[in-house]
Amino acid sequence: MRQLPPFSSKVFLAPMAGVSDPALRLLCKELGAGLVVTEFTNIHAIVAKEAQLHNISEFIEFSPRERPLSVQLFGSDLEALERAVKIVSPHFDLIDYNMGCPAPHVTEQMACSALLQHPDLTRHIFRTMVNATDKPVTVKIRAGISTPDRFLEIARIAEEEGISMITFHPRTVKQGYSGKSDWSLIKELKENVSIPVVGNGDIETPEDALRMLNETGCDYVMIGRAAMKNPSIFKQIKQYLETGKYDQVSDGERMEAFFRYLEYTKLYPTIRFVNIKMQAMNFTRGMKGGKGVREKLRTVKDEGELREVLMVLRTENNL
């Protein structure tokens, strides 16, 4: 196991396809996230782009201000995986491997959570990655396919092959994101490995984060969906863990955070407007008048129209 970089807090931002773009990652980092992770990236795409790019940051955009920064990969072809790891290794602080995504369009490619059923291949994947880099290699897993019967075996293989940290989302692939995540499985995992464990799933408040840490013994927690509407949750959790209390976040502060995000998107040409619009819809969830605003946001065609809609909400709510 390689030494992990120091983290400024115990709270990490989850990699989320179409969501955790570099602008949101930078915002969350500034608001207290101890680690941010890129959206998952296909190893074949990295290899294919290598000859066209002067630097991998032209394909996977990021800012030095995000550090420590983890890049998440998926794909099971060992030759492509080795090459992809070598390409990204000089540019990132950690390399994460996705064995958690339940989406059929990736599991059908023998990738992500489909690999939970293939421990031998998984061992070769971990070994290939660790041997291809001097950076810490980490993995994100689920509990199993239809029952929680795979995570301990995969975790033991990970530890044996030199994986430095495991992030665990204790739902099955069949569950997707429905039902409740079973935190008792995080506790079971932590009791069976000696490497750091990151708990993930159903953390909506600072109280939830502390409860997960206390109930499971996990070393860190990872926030996904809750950060989509309130990126200040990282600051709140950090405050709560350090002092036992935290500041409430007003709708005005959430709106300010979105406009900060909007400014950051200008630094990254690969962020599409459709994603910016989706982020605006996420940020307005729970706000007074937010439902009507989201209906209007669905039809906006550019940043100017988006700003007009949000400025009306700010004026009406005195934000």
Regions found by a protein language model. Name each.
Residues 1-7, 16-87:
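Glycine-rich, positively charged N-terminal anion/phosphate-binding segment
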Residues 16-18, 41-43, 74-76, 100-102, ...:
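Active-site beta-loop-alpha junctions enriched in small/polar residues
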Residues 82-95, 99-109, 120-195:
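Alpha/beta enzyme core
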Residues 1, 7, 22-23, 127, ...:
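Alpha/beta catalytic cores of nucleotide-metabolism and tRNA/nucleoside-modifying enzymes
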Residues 11-15, 36-38, 69-73, 95, ...:
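Hydrophobic faces of well-ordered beta-strands that scaffold small-molecule active sites
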Residues 13, 28, 39, 71, ...:
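Conserved, mostly hydrophobic/aromatic
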